[in-house]
Amino acid sequence: MDLRLRRGTDRDAIAVSALYLRARKAAKATIPMTVHPDDEVRRWIAERIVPHTELWVAEDDGGALVGLLVLDEDWLEQLYVEPTLTGRGIGSELVGLAKRARPKGLRLWTFESNLGAQRFYERHGFRPTERTAGDNEEGAPDILYVWDAS
């Protein structure tokens, strides 16, 4: 599959929201469900993520949105791939883009229960540096991962 990576725009808000919600629901066995209703998530993406962060989207050959990446300063805030397309390199392409965009380093949180994400980020050179007992809105233990280019 050929991927096109590009900056997300306000025209992408609906598709980004749909992908985000599908991916979160598909991962419900490994991550806590969002504490916000779907409409609130859509509004958050349209009003906060799109205009105030660095949003990137991955599109397939047909123009369908198959992945998303959100960067905010040195934070990799969100990375989601179409659930039916995991394991095909889309997430790796997005992480590579994040590293190129932030060559001095990146930080991210992932849930302790999300072992797949932990393996994925560790394969990409991130290392765990801190663990919490659930000091987040989901109340779930999480892990801070850091990548630096050195």
Regions found by a protein language model. Give the residues of each.
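A short beta-loop-alpha structural element at the N-terminal edge
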Residues: 4-18
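Conserved GNAT-fold acetyl-CoA-binding loop/helix
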Residues: 17-46
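A short helix-loop-beta-strand connector motif used in the catalytic cores of GNAT acetyltransferases and
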Residues: 46-57, 75
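Conserved beta-strand in the GNAT
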Residues: 57, 63-80
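Conserved acetyl-CoA pyrophosphate-binding loop and the N-cap/start of the following alpha-helix
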Residues: 85, 89-97
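Conserved GNAT acetyl-CoA-binding A-motif
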Residues: 101-113
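Conserved catalytic-core motifs of GNAT/GCN5-like acyltransferases
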Residues: 107-110, 127-144
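Conserved active-site tyrosine of GNAT-family acetyltransferases
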Residues: 121, 126
